[in-house]
């Protein structure tokens, strides 16, 4: 090769200083479109919320560059001085917020938090007992398509057919018959207060672990607006971060029992995860700090007030609310009670056309398939964060009712959409 011939670069150097817009216009544009969608829609999905800029800053930080397999002061990698401190702060804040002795902040999601606990406390084939998915349970509480129904022998309790509320005498009967090793209390679509003390009594009677999954109500529990599972001596509490707790997407495990905590830590790492997402753990720490502020409790109080007012507004228009009322941040509407031709999917799809976003949801003893459903689920956390108050939710109920009564009238729906945008404009200044 001649001396002056330059070797052709096979892999052009990437300019790491470029911002997203300059580096990847396609993804940048889609994020901008999503940003606009979130501003231009009334978001009523109960499992969604808007995080603070501080949480976004932490989650989008350079901490994403660091690998930190293991736990603070027990890592398999060097260079973990700073991330050890961050994880310890997150743990300290989590335990203080929920009144627990021990916390694992590494689960990537609520599902993995549950999986880690099951891995720690159960053997394949052990019996578990949770609420039926159709009645408001969760996939990870024993559904056959989940690890919880695949690795373990899952059994279910139901809500009372008349009240659509938990029937603790019936749950006790099921537990005595099944003799589960683990009982799960906590739900994805249940609007009433959970009596953890009664669950503790049932669990003790059959010598079962009591696991409280507070993913949906964590923000309420943290503020004392819903009974805390630890007041009932729950063995383990699991949660997500991103619903009423208003944090980043991720999971959390809490316990007061040292031996269980050691097992749970092993269940998460090396049981089901490798390196934790330190940038997300930092964002969790920020969210825990925010949740300890007085303003956060006022926010949670407003979430409950808004949900209660919202549900009553629908009842006054002839809609049936599952279980009759709500004690928390969400409620279910039985749309078939309004019109037997309606389905949850049909109503949810129509509402999205007018910039109101809900999700289709099964209701207790639903005869429709899960992708069709007889109900819709509605939550108030996200729009309460935006600034909605009771009168705003009454206005939304009125708009939704008008749209539902003109389901197939595209011209009328277009007019309703403009009213939705006008309502939102007050909060987007």
From Swiss-Prot:
One of its GO terms (cellular component) is cytosol. Pathway: One-carbon metabolism; tetrahydrofolate interconversion; Amino-acid biosynthesis; glycine biosynthesis; glycine from L-serine: step 1/1. It is found in: Cytoplasm. It catalyses: (6R)-5,10-methylene-5,6,7,8-tetrahydrofolate + glycine + H2O = (6S)-5,6,7,8-tetrahydrofolate + L-serine. InterPro entries: PyrdxlP-dep_Trfase, PyrdxlP-dep_Trfase_major, PyrdxlP-dep_Trfase_small, Ser_HO-MeTrfase, Ser_HO-MeTrfase-like, Ser_HO-MeTrfase_PLP_BS, SHMT-like_dom. Its main location: cytoplasm. It holds the Pfam family SHMT. One of its GO terms (molecular function) is pyridoxal phosphate binding. Its cofactor is pyridoxal 5'-phosphate. Keywords: Amino-acid biosynthesis, Cytoplasm, One-carbon metabolism, Pyridoxal phosphate, Transferase. It comes from the Bacteria. The keyword Disulfide bond does not apply. The modification N6-(pyridoxal phosphate)lysine is found at residue 243. GO terms for biological process: glycine biosynthetic process from serine; tetrahydrofolate interconversion. Its EC number is 2.1.2.1. (6S)-5,6,7,8-tetrahydrofolate binds at residues 133, 137-139, 259. The record marks 242 as: Plays an important role in substrate specificity. Homodimer. NCBIfam families: PRK00011.1. Catalyzes the reversible interconversion of serine and glycine with tetrahydrofolate (THF) serving as the one-carbon carrier. This reaction serves as the major source of one-carbon groups required for the biosynthesis of purines, thymidylate, methionine, and other important biomolecules. Also exhibits THF-independent aldolase activity toward beta-hydroxyamino acids, producing glycine and aldehydes, via a retro-aldol mechanism. Belongs to the SHMT family. This is Serine hydroxymethyltransferase. It comes from Aster yellows witches'-broom phytoplasma (strain AYWB). The gene is glyA.
């Amino acid at each position: 090769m001649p001396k002056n011939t330059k070797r052709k670069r096979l892999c052009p150097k990437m300019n790491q200083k470029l911002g997203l817009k300059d580096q990847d216009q396609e993804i940048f544009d889609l994020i901008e479109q999503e940003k606009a969608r979130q501003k231009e829609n009334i978001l009523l999905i109960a499992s969604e919320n808007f995080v603070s800029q501080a949480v976004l800053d932490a989650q989008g930080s350079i901490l994403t560059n660091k690998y930190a397999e293991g736990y603070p002061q027990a890592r398999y990698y060097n260079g973990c001085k700073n991330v050890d401190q961050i994880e310890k702060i997150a743990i300290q804040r989590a335990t203080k917020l929920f009144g627990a002795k021990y916390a694992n902040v590494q689960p990537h999601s609520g599902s993995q938090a549950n999986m880690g606990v099951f891995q720690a406390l159960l053997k394949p084939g052990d019996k578990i007992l949770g609420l039926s998915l159709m009645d408001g349970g969760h996939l990870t509480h024993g559904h056959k398509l989940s690890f919880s129904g695949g690795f373990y022998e899952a059994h279910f309790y139901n809500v009372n057919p008349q009240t659509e509320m938990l029937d603790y005498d019936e749950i006790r009967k099921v537990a005595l018959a099944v003799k589960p090793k683990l009982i799960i209390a906590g739900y994805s679509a249940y609007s009433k207060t959970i009596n953890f003390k009664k669950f503790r009594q049932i669990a003790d009677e059959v010598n079962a672990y009591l696991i409280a999954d507070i993913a949906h109500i964590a923000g309420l529990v943290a503020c004392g607006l819903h009974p805390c599972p630890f007041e009932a001596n729950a063995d383990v509490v699991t949660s997500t971060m991103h619903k009423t707790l208003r944090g980043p997407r991720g999971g959390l495990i809490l316990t007061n029992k040292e031996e269980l905590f050691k097992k749970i830590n092993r269940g998460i790492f090396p049981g089901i995860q490798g390196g934790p997402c330190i940038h997300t753990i930092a964002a969790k720490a920020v969210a825990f700090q925010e949740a300890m502020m007085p303003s956060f409790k006022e926010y949670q109080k407003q979430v409950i007030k808004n949900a209660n007012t919202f549900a009553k507004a629908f009842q006054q228009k002839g809609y049936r609310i599952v279980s009759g009322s709500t004690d928390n941040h969400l409620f279910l509407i039985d749309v078939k009670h309004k019109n037997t031709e309606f389905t949850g999917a049909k109503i949810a799809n129509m509402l999205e056309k007018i910039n109101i976003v809900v999700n289709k949801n099964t209701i207790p003893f639903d005869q429709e398939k899960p992708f069709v459903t007889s109900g819709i689920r509605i939550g108030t956390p996200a729009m309460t964060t935006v600034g909605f108050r009771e009168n705003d939710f009454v206005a939304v109920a009125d708009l939704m009712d008008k749209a539902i009564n003109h389901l197939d009238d595209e011209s009328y729906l277009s007019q309703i959409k403009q009213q939705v945008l006008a309502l939102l404009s007050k909060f987007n200044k």
